[in-house]
A protein has these predicted regions:
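Structural alpha/beta core scaffold segments of enzyme domains
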Residues: 1-130
Length: 130
């Protein structure tokens, strides 16, 4: 209905790639019990269900043998809405060691771990009526 507008404004906006910069760094603790073939993963994930499925797939374990615990997270702002590689590595190391492994990423590693929001161009056309 832009044809009926009294004022039309069209503009293109460019947004650079954005990396999430939440205060809380990425961290995970995984504990493997070899005698029971069970894994418990504590992670800052925002998607424990997806992490659970991905751990089972990556480790080749039955999902019933994996437990994911998601503590209170101070804020991920979209950074943790998918399983991240450090969570898989922590779990794999715990299983290989037959015990417990803790991983905490540095700020630089947090930026490298997640792809962030991609560079975007938005073309917008607005029609305003008096």
């Amino acid at each position: 209905m832009v044809k009926l507008a009294d004022l039309v404004r069209e503009q293109t906006f460019h947004y650079a790639e954005v990396a999430h910069g939440q205060i809380e760094l990425n961290a995970a603790v995984a504990a493997y019990e070899p005698e029971r073939d069970r894994l418990t993963s504590h992670s800052v994930t925002q998607v424990p269900y997806y992490l659970h499925l991905t751990l089972a797939q990556c480790l080749g374990m039955d999902s019933s043998r994996i437990r994911v615990v998601k503590p209170f997270v101070g804020g991920g702002f979209g950074h943790r809405v998918e399983p991240l590689n450090f969570e898989m590595v922590t779990a794999a190391l715990a299983r290989a060691a037959g015990g417990m492994v803790r991983t905490e990423l540095s700020r630089e590693e947090c930026f490298l771990t997640h792809r962030g929001r991609p560079e975007t161009d938005i073309r917008l056309k607005l029609g305003l009526k008096k």
